Regions:
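Buried hydrophobic positions in well-ordered alpha/beta secondary-structure cores of metabolic enzymes
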Residues: 20, 89, 119, 141, ...
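A short, Trp-centered hydrophobic/proline-enriched beta-strand micro-motif
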Residues: 135-143
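Amphipathic, small/basic residue-rich leader segments at the start of a protein or domain
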Residues: 1-104, 125, 129, 161
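Glycine-rich beta->alpha junctions and the first turn(s) of the following alpha-helix
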Residues: 2-12, 213-302
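Glycine-rich phosphate/pyrophosphate-binding beta-alpha loops
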Residues: 148, 173-179, 222, 265-269
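N-terminal glycine-rich flavin-associated loop
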Residues: 98-121, 149
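Cytochrome P450 C-terminal beta-domain/meander region
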Residues: 151-169
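A short core secondary-structure module
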Residues: 169-213
């Protein structure tokens, strides 16, 4: 495998370094002091969109080939694929502040599930606005509940069929960016006794009756990132908003879709951890050097 960073990705990394010094790190410090997320109307998000961030992997009904193109010049570095470039950029953003990094506009954690599970109409309706992003917009994902965290098979939010609609009843917590999102991909169960087999995912739009009581969670860290709890009080969702349609779940595929979403993000989480670790090391060394640390050679010589 070729680990060389192509010129385009390197240029984006360098631009992020400048953005990190000017905006990302200061916004993270400000959020820590104020104890609240960076507001969605902040000019930083406009700037980020202007740099091309927040767009979806979905290419529209016609689609496009996103595989790296071979260069005619054998000595020229090939442009790396989107996944590898995303890892490097996520690492760089998290170096400056992970809370600000994960607050970035975009379709959110549910993007992968919509692409892999959604109908063509659902992909077009919910992801096409993110193809050519002209302003900051967000999508969100809601799986976690007060009594169901990593054990996603234990979710209790109910989905009850009512004619052509579904009625959602339950509570969600730690849903990233959900109060500012155009839609939330909400996971619920048609029957808790079915365990994983009862899972269903619904595209719940902002403003739907019964989607209410948004509350930003208080956390020890990631203050710039909006982690939200909310309630579904008999929230009525059209049948067409069931992700993938009813036939998709006949093979107990709901849980597989949820896990595919999480699995797709694991490399990004690892990249972010590397960025945070690099930042912690650099800050620690800078502090030790500036304070001389009794001229300890273990610090002085590094």
């Amino acid at each position: 495998m070729d680990f060389a960073i192509d010129r385009t990705t390197q240029q984006r990394i360098e631009k992020l370094q400048a953005l990190g010094r000017e905006h990302i790190r200061p916004l993270g410090i400000e959020a820590d002091k104020l104890g609240r997320p960076t507001p969605p109307e902040h000019p930083y998000f406009e700037k980020l969109v202007g740099m091309g961030y927040g767009r979806t992997r979905y290419k529209g009904r016609k689609g496009q080939d996103d595989t790296p193109k071979k260069s005619a010049d054998k000595n020229k570095t090939k442009r790396m694929g989107r996944s590898r470039a995303s890892l490097l950029l996520s690492e760089q953003m998290s170096y400056w502040d992970r809370g600000v990094a994960v607050s970035a506009p975009g379709p959110g954690l549910g993007e992968g599930a919509i692409i892999s599970m959604g109908t063509e109409d659902q992909k077009e309706r919910y992801l096409s606005p993110f193809i050519k992003l002209d302003k900051p917009r967000w999508g969100a994902f809601a799986m976690t509940e007060p009594a169901a965290g990593s054990d996603v098979a234990s979710i209790q939010t109910r989905a009850i069929k009512d004619g052509d609609n579904w009625v959602l009843i339950g509570n969600k917590s730690f849903s990233g960016n959900s109060s500012r999102s155009d839609f939330i991909l909400v996971w619920a169960t048609v029957d808790p006794s079915l365990g994983r087999g009862g899972h269903r995912a619904f595209l719940v739009e902002r403003g739907m009756p019964g989607l209410q009581d948004f509350h930003i969670e208080k956390k020890m860290g990631l203050k710039a990132y909006e982690s939200t709890s909310f309630r579904l009080e008999e929230c009525r969702v059209p049948g067409e908003n069931l992700l993938g349609g009813e036939a998709y779940y006949e093979s107990r595929a709901g849980f597989k879709g949820a896990m595919a979403t999480f699995n797709a993000t694991r490399p990004l989480i690892a990249a972010m951890a590397v960025g945070i670790g690099r930042s912690a090391l650099d800050e620690s060394l800078a502090f030790a050097r500036e304070n001389q640390m009794l001229d300890d050679p273990r610090v002085r010589d590094r």
